[in-house]
């Protein structure tokens, strides 16, 4: 009966398997294995309390590492990491534990913000199974998270010893090199991002005629050719890498750029000699000789280390008419004007979302505060408007050229790591970027200076600090 039930279980026929498991328990009420298997069925169905009950019953009959592992997963699903850790630590005390227990324990420690213990558990897991790519990868990622890029690079390389062709590892290895400002090596490995879930991966959907139309540019002489470059990531990346457009113009006869439609007018205003294409312009209806994804530009240009930060002072600006429009409508006052943004695009990262009420210390200062929040998170504006004097600019942000017009009128921008922060930096506007503890690859180990933008200051969340505490620190510096 057990073999039949287990086969049904393996085939995903959970109700049929459960029925037989219960019949077995009627005859064998102390069968720990069956209680554990029933727990796994309930875990699969997300019936967590019932799963917990069954697996605890299994453990009361027999102490088994696999049972402890499954019980830990119940608490992981519940996001009760403290209890999960207690279960796994108890397993290590009571039974012989192998690789999987220590691997899960390392994950639990990380989720519970116990990073040193997480590191120790991963190292123990690797001691038990040195060829585990997932343990090497997670430990490397932990080191990257903890701003220890040299150790991250070491363990990403160990992953490659196990699986030399893992594009995901090669991509994350590039982020380690970026943190150390080794861009010559980092940009080479960064090309592996094109094998991940980006717009370029889905070229047949986003750019259906691209590969058939012309070859990728590999850095060869194109002085008599037309180059086409196109977006592949977020607004902030396009703004940050727009610094290379003048260099590209010098390399080719004609330059075509396809940014997102929200950036098109800003690029037209700043690069009048470049043909800026509309979002759904069809590649098969225009002429170009070679093409390149926008984030590949530094690599193909052969930029090394600090060369990548060219034009770090100011390379974008707003048009006079839009500056004047916002000045007359919003900025005719003598107060110190601060524009704030609390949330970027959560499609990419969710830890860049800041509780709007964390900005409260700014309202205790004699400033005039403006909201530049758009898209996701804009609904949070009312939480501030109900308590404080704050003006919403976003309803006039038809595209980034309008946003630039507004920013030209403010004295300071305070923003999460978002496109607004990149725009402020590219315009040379004083800007404070609020970084989570696990910050993005674009920022380096030394946060006392922003290499990309001279006008930007970086404030990083402490390991156990909250956004309210960070904002109080910032308020003292204004």
Say what each PLM segment does.
Residues 1-412, 417-478:
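Alpha-helical solenoid repeat scaffolds of the TPR/TPR-like class and their adjacent stem/linker regions
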